[in-house]
Amino acid sequence: MIQTKSRLDVADNTGAKSVLCIKVLGGSKRRYASVGDIIKVSIKEAAPRGRVKKGEVYSAVVVRTAKGIRRGDGSLVKFDGNAAVLLNAKLEPIGTRIFGPVTRELRTERFMKIVSLAPEVL
């Protein structure tokens, strides 16, 4: 469960290491984001020669949450931390690699690219 001011790790090779959620997209009163939701983020920590710079604002999709996601069969998939993948204006991933597992809930038409790049889909 991600909200404004939440810190997330970055699960791609754009050069960003840590981001801060500045807005949950999808309605004026929307408070929380879960796996598969799009958020606006500010880069808080970045590698020196990465594609992105500290302070820049991007869209991102949440790929892992510590809160977890409930499946239809009653099982719950949780992770150790929160992570996101940075997106460009067309909502395509900026990076060319994804690190760590992602959930099956990302398997929609919008995020098939992320699922195909991920080393493991839970």
UniProtKB/Swiss-Prot annotation:
Record-linked CDD domains: Ribosomal_uL14
The chain's coiled-coil residues are: none
The entry's keywords: Ribonucleoprotein, Ribosomal protein, RNA-binding, rRNA-binding
InterPro entries reported in the protein's UniProt record? Ribosomal_uL14, Ribosomal_uL14_bac-type, Ribosomal_uL14_CS, Ribosomal_uL14_sf
Gene Ontology BP annotations: translation
Keyword Transferase appears in the UniProt entry: no
Q: Which residue ranges traverse the bilayer?
A: none
Q: Where is the signal peptide?
A: none
Any one GO molecular-function label of the UniProt entry: structural constituent of ribosome
Its cellular-component GO annotations read: cytosolic large ribosomal subunit
Q: Give the SMART domains listed for this entry.
A: Ribosomal_L14
Describe, as the record does, how this protein assembles with itself and its partners. Answer: Part of the 50S ribosomal subunit. Forms a cluster with proteins L3 and L19. In the 70S ribosome, L14 and L19 interact and together make contacts with the 16S rRNA in bridges B5 and B8.
Q: Summarize the protein's role.
A: Binds to 23S rRNA. Forms part of two intersubunit bridges in the 70S ribosome.
- Could you say which protein family the record assigns here? Belongs to the universal ribosomal protein uL14 family.
Q: Which PANTHER family match?
A: 50S/60S RIBOSOMAL PROTEIN L14/L23, LARGE RIBOSOMAL SUBUNIT PROTEIN UL14M
Task: Identify this protein by name.
Answer: Large ribosomal subunit protein uL14
Taxonomic lineage of the native organism = Bacteria, Pseudomonadati, Pseudomonadota, Betaproteobacteria, Burkholderiales
